[in-house]
Design a protein with these regions (language model features):
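Short Asp/Glu-rich motifs
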Residues: 56-57, 91, 117-118, 148, ...
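Active-site beta->alpha loop and helix N-cap motifs at the rims of alpha/beta catalytic domains
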Residues: 2-13, 17-146
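C-terminal alpha-helical cap/extension of soluble enzyme domains
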Residues: 7-18, 36, 40-41, 202-205, ...
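Catalytic alpha/beta core domains of metabolic enzymes, predominantly
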Residues: 144-250
Length: 294
């Protein structure tokens, strides 16, 4: 396994984008959040994903937040940048026109809304990977895209030298199991589901890109590291401790719950951009109780 792939094993964190009360980006809080997850034992960062509310950022804000995350990280960990589109040519142009110096790879989501066929998905990602100067990690999340990438399609794409892995967020465990059992070791299998991640890792996956690890990187990293070391008992102990929190932060959707948790930790304001809204008083109270006791 090459050096980059080995660095992308373990716990990646799907980073939030902090906002101020006036909905502008809180660049100072980006530094606080980055320091928090790194000190908690995260292995790498993922910016401009779903959790980062990327669809609400202007192009100028995307450029500035990229710079801010890179500066805050200060070369301590690899950083993956999220870039996706339901227009293949637009995505290729966007990748090649963007300054991505400092990023290790691109996380690219399955095209959404227009629901391509499996052959369309294969052609889309093949063309993107062949045109990209950076390695591509596929991202399958059918609950958001309304399009599932079949594991046999992923297997075909894994033969492309510039496609180095997949974040698999299909809740059907048989899908990630197929990939674990049929891909080569130089293709990363990354869970995209906080709740089942340790079970996937115990079965042979390489790690997780986690939402919950924004708030509790220490416990989450210990859970995943225990699983990577084959320690089923220890991994399950951490799972039992943090699973109530995982359920809470997804109760009203992501990133509503995790933003509430980060506020309780004093790391940022509990502010989201419309059409997303902050957590209800009831959920905020439950999250506050967990954070104060964990």
């Amino acid at each position: 396994m090459n050096t980059l792939l080995s660095k992308l094993k373990g716990t990646g964190v799907a980073m939030i984008t902090p906002f101020k009360s006036d909905f502008s980006i809180d660049y100072d809080s980006i530094k606080k959040v980055v320091d928090h997850v790194i000190s908690g034992g995260a292995n790498y960062l993922v910016v401009h994903g779903t959790t980062g509310e990327t669809s609400t950022l202007s192009e100028d804000e995307k450029v500035e937040t990229r710079k801010c995350f890179l500066k805050a990280n200060d070369n301590r960990l690899p950083i993956i940048i999220g870039m996706g589109s339901n227009s293949t040519n637009s995505l290729i142009n966007y990748i090649n026109e963007s300054n991505l110096n400092g990023f290790s790879a691109i996380l690219s989501v399955v095209p959404y809304y227009n629901r391509p066929s499996q052959d369309g998905l294969f052609q889309h990602f093949s063309k993107v990977a062949n045109a990209s100067p950076y390695p591509i990690i596929l991202y399958n999340v059918p609950s958001r895209t309304s399009c599932n990438m079949d594991p046999t399609t992923t297997l075909r794409l894994s033969k492309n030298k510039n496609i180095i892995g997949i974040k698999e967020a299909n809740p059907d465990i048989t899908q990630i199991s197929f990939l674990i059992n049929n891909t080569n070791e130089d293709f990363l299998i990354i869970s995209g589901d906080d709740e089942s991640a340790h079970r996937s890792v115990l079965s042979g996956a390489d790690g997780v890109i986690s939402v919950a690890a924004n708030a509790i990187p220490d416990l989450f990293s210990k859970k995943i590291n225990s699983a990577l070391n084959g320690n089923n008992k220890k991994s399950n102990e951490f799972f039992e401790k943090i699973n109530p929190f995982i359920k809470l932060i997804y109760e009203e959707g992501n990133p509503t719950g995790i933003k509430s948790a980060m506020f309780e930790l004093g790391l940022c304001e509990n502010v989201l951009r419309l059409p997303l809204v902050s957590s209800s008083n009831d959920l905020s109270s439950h999250i506050r109780n967990f954070i104060s006791n964990y």
